[in-house]
């Protein structure tokens, strides 16, 4: 077995059971990995120097094929309603079979770190079958200094072999695709999928398990910080504007997706970004667009024309086209990945029912309620003529990645908000003047004006009214914003229709939250929409 590149000489792949490999390439850099990926036919070179790969059958995550080893340590720690279990015995058979499958292969290894805060960092070794996967994860996680590699000690190892097909009977899984996580021993096995995002989200899942034990809050969010050190956190599901609204030329970007919150402040888990590329335009998102024209960026499932120019409007392979690039490709990105204690939390929702106000102030209890709810609404199946909005509740704004019970994260968040005096806002980027099909999308200039007032603190001085349906505080007037739009009922042509729609949404919140009722205290239960109205 030939071994190339810089590494800790005392920790080779044989230490985790690999044998009879052809060549192992440790910590290769972008130019080397380009050469490998192109020579092996894994990817194409684009006209502007990015690397473009296709993932085949799997163009997104496979949440139904993700498993956590259920053992003595995890049995009482994992939220099994939301996480599928695999036995230690099945996992061991899977591990041995994957190691046997790798015999004769050339593999790529990256020694990286999850977490910009040294006290809460997770040194991670990623072993991949594909060279482009090695570059992808090198872009996404934090790269240690080259001088640190000879002493690198991983606490988590990820083995990603897309050509391995799992056997559902033999391996105790659902299909040929498997993402199996042994939290006790720090090992993740990925097989049967070429989708690179599985590696990134596996690191996130492990950090989401480990950090609460240290009273550190892991978050599926973006974050930025102003010139005065005023950190803001943006929670929000896909399509709510999290990436767009946190990209502010007047503020430093900490990160776009995964962060931790400790007693010292906020820190990015990653060293890169994994941005959606479908319908990407230079006019709308110039900074992200510019990364697609840089050497080192990895594009996933983006269609190229015969001149090797990307067509970002072509979703024929998938709507989930992506580009992965190091954070330093963004001009105003933080060099440290850390920021002071948050002053503001923004919870984004795209309410397609058109009943939520464009902004509302939340108490700590209401913030926990809405964090556990993780609400947005999307317009489902419009291409088939279905125009009825569909409510989506994804707890903690990232249910697929939360191994512990949501109440653990919710209580951590509530305590951190109270301890640091953080102001929380719910921001609706969805519809106004009616539901989807009748109303219109909330103007982005209105959202930005309200966000600016929230972030600079001036909105705290506004006059507020209590919303009759949801119980939160809504500003009556904000400079530069038409007062009428702040009261959603007044924007509807039919006030009675608004009341009916609002009550329907309140009922959806209550029905969804029923599963959390016994896990939260009375103050959070009392923060439910409709609770205040019922009490009065």
From Swiss-Prot:
E.C. number: 4.1.1.49
Cofactor comment: Binds 1 Mn(2+) ion per subunit.
Catalytic activity field: oxaloacetate + ATP = phosphoenolpyruvate + ADP + CO2
Positions contributing to Mn(2+) binding: 201, 220, 257
Location (main, coarse): cytoplasm
One Gene Ontology term from the biological process aspect of the record: gluconeogenesis
Binding site for substrate: 61, 195, 201, 322
Cofactors, names only: Mn(2+)
Official protein name in the record: Phosphoenolpyruvate carboxykinase (ATP)
Annotated source species: Rhizobium meliloti (strain 1021)
């Amino acid at each position: 077995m030939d071994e190339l590149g810089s590494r800790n000489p005392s920790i080779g792949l044989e230490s985790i059971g690999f044998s009879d490999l052809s060549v192992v390439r440790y910590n290769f850099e972008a130019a080397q990995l380009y050469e490998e990926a192109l020579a092996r036919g894994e990817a194409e070179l684009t006209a502007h120097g990015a690397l473009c790969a296709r993932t085949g059958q799997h163009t997104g995550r496979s949440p139904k094929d993700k498993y956590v080893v259920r053992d003595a340590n995890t049995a009482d720690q994992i939220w099994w309603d939301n996480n599928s279990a695999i036995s230690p015995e099945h996992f061991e058979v899977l591990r041995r079979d994957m190691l046997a499958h790798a015999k004769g292969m050339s593999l790529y290894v990256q020694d990286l770190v999850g977490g910009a805060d040294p006290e809460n960092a997770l040194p991670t070794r990623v072993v991949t079958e594909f060279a482009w996967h090695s570059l992808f994860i090198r872009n996404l996680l934090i790269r240690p200094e080259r001088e640190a590699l000879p002493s690198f000690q991983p606490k988590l190892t990820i083995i990603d072999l897309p050509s391995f097909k799992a056997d559902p009977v033999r391996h105790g899984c659902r299909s040929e695709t498997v993402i199996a996580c042994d939290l006790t021993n720090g090992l993740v096995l990925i097989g049967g999928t070429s989708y690179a995002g599985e590696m990134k989200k596996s690191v996130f899942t492990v950090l989401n398990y480990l950090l609460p034990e240290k009273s550190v809050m892991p978050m599926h969010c973006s974050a930025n910080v102003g010139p005065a050190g005023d950190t803001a956190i943006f929670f929000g599901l896909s399509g709510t504007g999290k990436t767009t609204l946190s990209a502010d030329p007047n503020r430093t970007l900490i990160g776009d997706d995964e962060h931790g919150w400790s007693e010292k402040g906020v820190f990015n888990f990653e060293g890169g970004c994994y941005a959606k590329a479908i319908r990407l335009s230079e006019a709308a998102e110039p900074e992200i667009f510019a990364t697609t024209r840089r050497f080192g960026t990895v594009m996933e499932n983006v269609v190229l024309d015969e001149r090797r120019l990307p067509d970002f409007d072509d979703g024929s392979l998938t709507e989930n086209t992506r580009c992965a690039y190091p954070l330093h490709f963004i001009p105003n990105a933080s060099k440290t990945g850390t920021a002071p204690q948050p002053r503001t939390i923004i919870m984004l929702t795209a309410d397609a029912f058109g009943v939520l106000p464009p902004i509302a102030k939340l108490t700590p209890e209401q913030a926990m309620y809405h964090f556990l709810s993780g609400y947005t609404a999307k317009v489902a199946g419009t291409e088939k003529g279905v125009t009825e909005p569909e409510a989506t509740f994804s707890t903690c704004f990232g249910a697929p990645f939360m191994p512990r019970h949501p109440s653990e994260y919710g209580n951590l968040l509530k305590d951190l908000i109270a301890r640091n005096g953080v102001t929380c806002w719910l921001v609706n980027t969805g519809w106004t003047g009616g539901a989807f099909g009748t109303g219109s999308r909330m103007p982005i200039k209105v959202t930005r004006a309200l966000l600016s007032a929230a972030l600079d603190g001036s909105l705290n001085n506004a006059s507020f009214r209590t919303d009759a349906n949801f119980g939160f505080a809504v500003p009556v007037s904000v400079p530069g914003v038409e007062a009428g739009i702040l009261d959603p009922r007044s924007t509807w042509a039919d006030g009675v229709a608004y009341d009916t729609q609002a009550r329907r949404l309140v009922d959806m919140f209550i029905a969804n939250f029923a599963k959390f009722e016994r896990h939260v205290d009375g103050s959070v239960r009392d923060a439910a929409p409709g609770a205040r109205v019922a009490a009065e």
